[in-house]
């Protein structure tokens, strides 16, 4: 399940976005799919690669992948007087199938997830190449909100309590990697234990 009004918090009004806007940043939301726009929230970002008409009234917001690399290249090259903040949503590697009827079994789901991981790595490399080429001093944060549930047959099994250490890590692990400008890595970088409050640390 998702938090009530989660899309509105992410897309319309949240502390991180407001900090950037209040400090003169131009903000961009680029996504491979309009999942976070499904309820047509008020757009808090200055620029988005989707319009309201791109998002249907009925659907999941998932399915067809949209190009994010072309607009990213365009907007990072754009010469403006403001600093820029980009929120880029990439959906791979995702997680195992949601329901038992869709499941390929533990081994099949693991193999499929590994394929999507390879696709994600390719997209990430292309994304980082564009950013570093057009903005060499960019601070880049790569973060996942949860694990891929690899080791399970299907996602709904996460609602069954388990003490299996590997499954717990597969469900709840969040991945975080930071590219610091000019390789200037602060000493607390290695002490990150969680992605929670990561922006509070970054902007302080």
Region locations from a protein language model:
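Catalytic domains that recognize anionic headgroups
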Residues: 1-204
């Amino acid at each position: 399940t998702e938090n009530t009004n989660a899309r509105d918090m992410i897309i319309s009004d949240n502390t991180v976005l407001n900090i950037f806007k209040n400090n003169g940043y131009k903000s961009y939301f680029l996504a491979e799919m309009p999942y976070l726009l499904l309820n047509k929230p008020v757009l808090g970002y200055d620029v988005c690669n989707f319009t309201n008409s791109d998002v249907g009234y009925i659907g999941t917001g998932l399915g067809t992948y949209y190009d994010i690399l072309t607009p990213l290249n365009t907007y990072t090259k754009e010469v403006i007087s403001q600093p820029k903040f980009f929120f880029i949503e990439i959906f791979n590697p995702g997680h195992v199938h949601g329901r038992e009827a869709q499941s390929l079994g533990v081994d099949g789901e693991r193999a499929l997830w590994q394929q999507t991981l390879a696709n994600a790595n390719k997209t990430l490399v292309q994304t980082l190449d564009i950013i570093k080429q057009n903005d060499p001093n960019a601070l880049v944060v790569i973060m996942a909100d949860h694990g891929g549930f690899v080791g399970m047959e299907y996602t709904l099994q996460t609602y069954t309590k388990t003490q299996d250490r590997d499954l717990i890590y597969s469900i709840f692990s969040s991945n975080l990697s930071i590219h610091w400008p000019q390789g200037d890595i602060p000493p607390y970088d290695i002490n990150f234990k969680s992605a929670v409050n990561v922006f509070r640390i970054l902007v302080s």
